[in-house]
């Protein structure tokens, strides 16, 4: 791994309720960066990005999600403004299947966070919504026929979606 002692020391101590993985952390232009396996480039290492990279690794390595069907920072047009979904899982036909929204570990997951991901879903109309701050993870399956949703006990494996 590409560790800069300054960058890695800060984030090695920030444990999450997610599996540990071999992060590639560096310092570029005086700023901490982490390698994003989806975007295939280094991105600014913020607390939210730390959660994203761990959660994406969890989906790929532990839940069997194909890297090629995941995208980070997906733009959606909503009421004339452009918003960004943190991570989107696509089907093989490239229609959206799942939205994942991340918050930093110190940010409480509130109704406002669910409202945010629900607004994105007004555009994408996915089957699953996930919200995580790295410590707590919530996943719900949408039921459009009955205009409801069900919270799941666990993040589903890819093959069970």
Question: What does each of the following model-derived ranges do?
Answer:
Residues 1-11:
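Single conserved hydrophobic/aromatic residue that forms the stacking wall/gate
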Residues 12-128, 135-161:
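A short, conserved, highly charged catalytic patch centered on acidic carboxylates
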